Amino acid sequence: MRSLVLLSSVLALVAPSKGAFTWLGTNEAGAEFGEGSYPGELGTEYIWPDLGTIGTLRNEGMNIFRVAFSMERLVPDSLAGPVADEYFQDLVETVNGITALGAYAVLDPHNYGRYYGNIITSTDDFAAFWTILATEFASNELVIFDTNNEYHTMDQSLVLNLNQAAIDAIRASGATSQYIFAEGNSWTGAWTWVDVNDNMKALTDPQDKLIYEMHQYLDSDGSGTNTACVSSTIGSERVTAATNWLRENGKLGVLGEFAGANNQVCKDAVADLLEYLEENSDVWLGALWWAAGPWWGDYMFNMEPTSGIAYQEYSEILQPYFVGSQ
């Protein structure tokens, strides 16, 4: 990142072209596992992603990895810190390991707008938390800051204000070159975005690198907990309204979570979703599968190489959308 050669490669990574994504990759889960068991024991309650298997996915064409972690483990006493040294260093090592591969690493506090189960109401405390993270990664242009995973059942103005507090704190910390992903209320669902999160268009970023992160699953209730997808076209249908919202408001989006189970309807639905997003890549910069990670076992969406069922069944579907494959 400190040389002109590397800077050129970074610019090549982020420059979108018509009909092509900027990012296609996967979530990396594990460090947020063991919810409620804090601080928990590494290897028992939680696990960090495997940089070896991330390297496999990177070599195959993925260029973005969203690293979930627990705020309670990172800052156990207060959102304002101090950090738990071992957990913090493990996070730093994971993120730097990803960016050393030339891929983007998304910092994902996987907390649903909550801290120890309580809704975060203090924008000052939230800003203090983000000051800690942004200061650490201020010089790494391949880091992306995701304000929080899937705010839900919260006051809508509070969701807006927490996002703005995070943006302001990140920029004030000197992290001015990185993208920021803002998430909305109601689990940041694309299919409910227009009805629930219209006020999010008021967010401002002095660096103009704000991306709206939405999630979308394809089962009947949109939860991503059922093996059946509604139809082969449900993907495009569920993101159409959000696509129009992005375009009408001059915003950019990323689908931060999507997935499908191992059946033909879901495979067709995922292909339909990706095709639609790529056709609208003037507003959709990319998408991330949910999820890879060492502990998924027989989970229906497991993207962990090489035994994960989704890795085996969906890699061929995802590959044409990898950046540089078009």
Curated annotation (Swiss-Prot):
Catalytic center residues: 150 (proton donor), 257 (nucleophile)
InterPro entries: Glyco_hydro_5 (IPR001547), Glycoside_hydrolase_SF (IPR017853)
UniProt-listed Enzyme Commission number(s): 3.2.1.4
Classification via Pfam families: Cellulase (PF00150)
SUPFAM superfamilies: (Trans)glycosidases
Temperature characteristics of this protein: Optimum temperature is 57 degrees Celsius.
GO CC terms in record: extracellular region
Main function: Has endoglucanase activity on substrates containing beta-1,4 glycosidic bonds, like in carboxymethylcellulose (CMC), hydroxyethylcellulose (HEC) and beta-glucan. Involved in the degradation of complex natural cellulosic substrates.
Protein name: Endo-beta-1,4-glucanase A
